[in-house]
Amino acid sequence: MSRIAKSPITLPSGVDVTINGTDVSVKGSKGALSKTFNHAVSVSLEDGVVTVAPKNESKNAWAQAGTARSIINNMVLGVTEGFEKKLQLVGVGYRAQAQGKVLNLTLGFSHPVNHELPEGVTVETPSQTEIVVKGADKQVVGQVAAEIRGYRPPEPYKGKGVKYADEYILRKEAKKK
């Protein structure tokens, strides 16, 4: 069993945490995040240190406490440093262009794909074949990146499609006659 729940979270300067029962709100330079946790978990704040503990000793309560601790830690990291996911477009004529809260994608379809961005997420396109998704909420950043990748996942024969920058595409050999 992992012991993640037992390690406390030290808050960096400039981060404000408010706890109201099972609701935890974190404010920082990159924004504010809030989350409601399971009733089997108690969260406490003392002298700039957040501790998470299960209310009883059941396996489920410890699992929920570990999850809550990881989520709170990611909230603190998100409002201080932020999270980012890099995507690459591989293929002839595949392009991306950010226009405010909309990402315009040309992915070889007969029509352009316009992806609406949720609140708290920004997208940059350093080049026409690169996309950088940034935000304070790790889950939302990952979800947006997965949705963008889902429009044209990489195929195994030529490697064409939208892929994560650090993703390795397992290539297949073409059928031999």
Curated annotation (Swiss-Prot):
InterPro entries: Ribosomal_uL6-like (IPR000702), Ribosomal_uL6-like_a/b-dom_sf (IPR036789), Ribosomal_uL6_a/b-dom (IPR020040), Ribosomal_uL6_bac-type (IPR019906), Ribosomal_uL6_CS (IPR002358). Keywords: Ribonucleoprotein, Ribosomal protein, RNA-binding, rRNA-binding. Gene3D superfamilies: Ribosomal protein L6, alpha-beta domain. Pfam families: Ribosomal_L6. One of its GO terms (cellular component) is cytosolic large ribosomal subunit. Part of the 50S ribosomal subunit. This is Large ribosomal subunit protein uL6. It comes from Hydrogenovibrio crunogenus (strain DSM 25203 / XCL-2). The gene is rplF.
